[in-house]
């Protein structure tokens, strides 16, 4: 498995992940992470009929009363997996301490934003998946309203993006329209003798209910 793209991301993310992945107090961790339980997700996709794909809109209702937006609960997010794309996953996530998106104003900005990503087998992640490709662009819009995530205007057809390492590498992503799973996840970092070696996707949980409203 080619791990090079993940290492490109790591160059940008190293300082941030080191500072944020251990922020959650272990004593109150269970209660604090209720926002990782997606009780219901509603998905709508539209197709403009020109063969270039359409747009995806989604609403995720999570357990608890408030999804963190200030970066104090570490790096976590939500994702949508489709059956008819090119293994591209739409993720919306938050993190303070790293700058990996055009939607962030500065490195400590925990502003929620979207990415297209691809997960893959990464040696340092063991049985977990690792990030092997990720866009600098933030496709569509995402907003948090108490315990509800609203995502809109996400293109489902092929798009060209720039790798978030800002190397200028061009990437192609096709999300697709047939959403098969909606997930929550946390991000973890792996360090070696030479520093940060991988960004792993951990604690993946599927939504309790996924409703496609097409």
What name fits each language-model region?
Residues 32-46, 51-56, 123, 166-168, ...:
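A broad structural signal for short, well-ordered beta-strand segments within beta-sheet-rich domains
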Residues 1-29:
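Secretory targeting signatures
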Residues 29-31, 116:
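Boundary at the C-terminal end of the N-terminal hydrophobic targeting segment
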Residues 160-214:
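Acidic/polar low-complexity flexible segments
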Residues 36-120:
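Surface-exposed, glycine/proline- and aromatic-rich loop segments on solvent-exposed faces
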Residues 51-59, 146-150, 170:
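A generic structural signal for beta-strand entry/edge sites
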Residues 94-95, 109-130, 145, 167-169, ...:
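Mature secreted bioactive peptide module from preproproteins
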Residues 123-162:
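Short helix-loop boundary/capping segments
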């Amino acid at each position: 498995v080619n791990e090079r793209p993940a290492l490109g991301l790591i160059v940008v993310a190293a300082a941030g992940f080191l500072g944020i992945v251990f922020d959650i107090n272990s004593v109150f961790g269970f209660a604090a992470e209720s926002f990782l339980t997606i009780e219901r997700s509603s998905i709508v996709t539209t197709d403009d009929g020109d063969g270039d794909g359409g747009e995806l809109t989604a609403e995720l209702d999570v357990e608890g009363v408030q999804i963190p937006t200030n970066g104090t609960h570490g790096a976590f997010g939500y994702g949508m997996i489709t059956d008819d794309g090119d293994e591209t996953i739409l993720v919306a996530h938050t993190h303070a301490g790293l700058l990996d998106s055009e939607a962030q104003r500065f490195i400590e900005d925990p502003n929620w934003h979207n990415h297209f990503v691809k997960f893959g087998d990464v040696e340092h992640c063991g049985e977990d998946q690792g990030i092997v490709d990720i866009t600098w662009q933030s496709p569509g819009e995402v907003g948090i309203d108490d315990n509800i995530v609203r995502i809109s205007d996400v293109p489902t057809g092929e798009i060209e993006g720039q790798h978030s390492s800002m190397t200028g590498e061009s990437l192609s992503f096709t999300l697709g329209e047939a959403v098969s799973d909606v997930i929550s996840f946390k991000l973890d970092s792996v360090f070696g003798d030479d520093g940060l070696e991988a960004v792993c996707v951990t604690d993946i949980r599927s939504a309790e209910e996924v409703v496609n409203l097409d």
